[in-house]
């Protein structure tokens, strides 16, 4: 299995372990496999047995082995077993599913059983194991420079804290996360963790990360890598839970020919890009539904064909803050597939985004056939919608949603008439992370799992930084210890 960039057809292909440590391609593009492995009905039936008899980690090893041929199978199985286990995850099923409304055939896939109570743990725990394994094999070290709007950073830090040969510099938008999210990250005092509060919004943080990566000399000197969703290994980890969710819902419904609709709360287009890849592999997903909040860049594209990024000033601070994103960093992967893997067109479009802030595919043949060929729908949700869905789901099902999952449930119900068959909303986080919104919706404080008791009372450490790449580089020079 070889990997190619979305931008340069002449560039040499790379192996999985090479791109694992690299993040962005040298030309600024994103990596994708040369071809997507194709799943047969027989393979899915066999995986049903693997999941039922041996568990989630065994399924993960099966799926990953289709994409990774430069890690021995036995080692890959060990990596998955260490990543997906209790008590790292609080539920032995790792990703259980629940039907929250039999009348609506509405399901939740529970992705928040990891150490930071967010779906990002699903990919990060695997990434931590992969990084440590490959760096150990090479006798090398890595500096992870990442950006987070809330959940990615804490998931990365909890997965990478204390690991040999790894340092983490994580950028956050100052004042844009909840107190719980800040406490989760800033209370980690490990020597290899550096938390940074940037004077700006999430996209400013992401731009700084990209600027560091584009400086080839600095990147090489400081062994810069990525854990943001531009890293292919993260997407690959997420593909597994779409397959697991489909298998579990098929088993519970008894429908051998199940075609499942998935609704994905979306900002960076990483989570739903994994659903797109699973669908391209032949997993029977009927529709892929993008659910956005008021920052509806993605919803606007699927409705109009125009992808128009927002400025920092036009990015709204909402009650589903992890989706307060104005530029979807993974979107390029889907556009590459949408355009028949035409890297020259893809490169030109995203160069246009960089210079003009938008591109328009509304008059193209590809956009006209987008829904037919790729199964996408999209809709957006508001603060009042979130409150209403949290309240309704609590009253009807006695299940407490977080605000991002509530965006997904709102969109699922909004588009229900267009979606035939069961609908699974991909849960993003536990409500404990968003106390203020939960109290507003249902009038009580969400229960705090024992592992998070008094987290906001712990000592915190964070470095404040302006929106300046040179300041970030100087911070890396002063804080990172280059050693294995």
Which role does the model predict for each range below?
Residues 1-484:
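PLP-dependent amino-acid enzyme catalytic core
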């Amino acid at each position: 299995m070889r990997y190619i960039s979305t931008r340069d057809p002449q560039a040499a292909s790379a192996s999985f372990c090479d791109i694992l440590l690299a993040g962005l391609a040298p030309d600024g593009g994103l990596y994708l496999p040369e071809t997507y492995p194709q799943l047969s009905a027989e393979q899915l039936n066999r995986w049903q047995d693997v999941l039922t008899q041996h568990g989630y980690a065994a399924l993960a090893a099966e799926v990953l082995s289709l994409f990774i041929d430069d890690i021995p199978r036995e080692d890959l199985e060990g990596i998955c077993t260490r990543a997906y286990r209790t008590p790292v995850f609080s539920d032995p099923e790792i990703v259980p599913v629940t039907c929250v409304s039999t009348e609506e055939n509405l399901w939740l896939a529970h992705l928040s059983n990891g150490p930071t109570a967010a779906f990002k743990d699903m990919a990060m725990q695997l990434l931590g194991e992969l990084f440590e394994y490959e760096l150990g094999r090479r006798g090398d070290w890595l500096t992870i420079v990442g950006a987070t709007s809330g959940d990615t950073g804490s998931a990365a830090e909890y997965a990478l804290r204390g690991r040999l040969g790894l340092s983490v510099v994580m950028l956050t938008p100052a004042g844009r996360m909840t107190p719980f999210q800040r406490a989760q990250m800033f209370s980690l005092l490990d020597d290899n963790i550096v938390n940074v509060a940037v004077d700006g919004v999430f996209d400013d943080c992401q731009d700084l990360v990209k600027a560091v990566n584009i400086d080839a000399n600095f990147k090489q000197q400081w062994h810069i890598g990525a854990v943001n969703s531009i890293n292919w290994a993260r997407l690959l980890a997420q593909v597994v839970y779409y397959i697991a969710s489909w298998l579990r819902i098929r088993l519970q419904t008894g429908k051998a020919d199940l075609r499942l609709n998935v609704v994905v709360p979306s900002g960076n287009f990483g989570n739903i890009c994994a659903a797109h890849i699973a669908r391209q592999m032949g997993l029977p997903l009927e529709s892929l539904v993008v659910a956005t909040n008021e920052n509806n860049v993605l919803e606007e594209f699927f409705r109009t064909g125009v992808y128009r990024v927002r400025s920092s000033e036009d990015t709204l601070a909402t009650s589903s803050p992890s989706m307060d994103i104005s530029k979807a960093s993974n979107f390029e992967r889907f556009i590459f597939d949408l355009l028949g893997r035409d890297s020259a067109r893809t490169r030109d479009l995203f160069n246009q985004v960089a210079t003009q802030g938008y591109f328009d595919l509304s008059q193209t043949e590809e956009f006209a056939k987008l829904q037919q060929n790729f199964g996408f729908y999209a809709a957006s949700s508001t603060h009042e919608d979130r409150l209403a869905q949290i309240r309704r789901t609590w009253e009807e099902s006695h299940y407490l949603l977080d605000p991002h999952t509530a965006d997904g449930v709102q969109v699922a119900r909004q588009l229900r008439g267009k979606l035939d068959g069961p609908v699974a909303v991909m849960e993003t986080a536990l409500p404990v992370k968003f106390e203020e919104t939960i109290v507003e919706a249902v009038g009580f404080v969400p229960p705090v799992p024992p592992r998070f008791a008094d987290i906001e009372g712990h000592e915190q450490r964070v470095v404040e930084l302006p929106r300046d790449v040179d300041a970030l580089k100087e911070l890396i020079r002063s804080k990172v210890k280059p050693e294995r």
